[in-house]
Regions:
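Substrate-binding pocket helix/loop in short-chain dehydrogenase/reductase
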Residues: 100-101, 108-113, 199
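Catalytic loop of short-chain dehydrogenase/reductase
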Residues: 138-164, 169-177, 190
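Canonical Rossmann dinucleotide-binding motif of NAD(H)/NADP(H)-dependent dehydrogenases/reductases
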Residues: 2-35
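Short, small/polar-rich loop/turn modules that mediate ligand/substrate recognition or access, typified
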Residues: 177-181, 227-230
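Conserved glycine-rich Rossmann-like NAD(P)H-binding loop of the short-chain dehydrogenase/reductase
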Residues: 30-46
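C-terminal substrate-recognition "lid" of short-chain dehydrogenase/reductases
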Residues: 210-234, 239
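Conserved NAD(P)H cofactor-binding loop of Rossmann-fold oxidoreductase domains
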Residues: 92-97, 236-237
Length: 241
């Protein structure tokens, strides 16, 4: 049977890093096929599909709200049906909001944990079961230098969610080995957050260089055979300060 190329599911693919991953990876390997998850960015995803399809790249959209955690198993099955399998899962979708620790409500905490930690956990659980059966698969979790190596004031619930995702990466890499490799990427200050009232990005690094390095790191992990349980900091050394 002819190999149809790796099938890659990217969550939060319509904007920011997710969008750049689609654009970058589609240039590196024309055989990749993409499942593009979105929630509120249908126009952006369709525009992205139109753009890469001009180069012969196949991509299919799928809408889902990760706050509906009880429906993630159904979402995973629907995503797998689009091409018949998923070879690579990239957990990229996340919420980034500032709020003082003593002002965080139960709803604030639940939403942050549901989208940034619980959703990747459940999605990885359901999709990896098929990967294990096929004895092949990759999972890449996008964490953050915030919550992994350092913390920011007023972002406690965000830091907790990303720190938990980093720990989850290591646990999954042990439990799913040797057939599924699980790694994480922890970007630094790359793209200014949307609607952020905090002036945290005065000294953020060259976005183009950072995005290129992130895309190349993802490509390395997609194609690697012997990298498992690692966290790749792509932050120009920011986490050392």
């Amino acid at each position: 049977m002819k190999d149809i190329g790796k099938i890659i599911l990217i969550t939060g693919s319509g904007r920011r890093i997710g969008k750049e991953l689609v654009l970058g990876l589609s240039k590196i390997d024309k055989n990749y096929k993409f499942i593009l998850h979105y929630n509120n960015s249908s126009k952006e995803v369709q525009s992205l599909i139109n753009k890469i399809s001009k180069d012969g790249i196949s991509a299919k959209p799928i809408k889902f709200n990760f706050l509906e955690t009880e429906k993630i198993e159904s979402f995973a099955h629907e995503a797998e049906k689009l091409y018949g399998r998923i070879d690579v899962l990239i957990n990229n979708a996340s919420i980034f909001k500032a709020k003082k620790f003593n002002k965080i409500s139960n709803k604030d905490l639940d939403e942050m944990i549901d989208v940034n930690l619980k959703a990747p956990f459940l999605l990885s659980k359901f999709i990896s079961s098929q990967m294990v059966k096929r004895k092949n698969g990759k999972i890449i979790n996008f964490t953050d230098s915030i919550g992994v190596t350092k913390t920011w004031k007023d972002y406690s619930h965000y830091c907790i969610s990303k720190g938990g995702l980093e720990t989850m990466t290591k646990v999954m890499s042990l439990e799913l080995a040797p057939y599924v490799q699980v790694n994480s990427i922890a970007p630094g200050k790359i793209l200014k957050p949307i609607n952020s009232s905090k002036n945290l990005y005065n000294n953020f690094y060259n976005s183009n260089d950072a995005i290129n390095d992130i895309v190349n790191t993802v490509y390395l992990l997609v194609e690697s055979k012997f990298i498992n349980g690692e966290s790749f900091k792509v932050d120009n050394g920011e986490s050392l300060t």
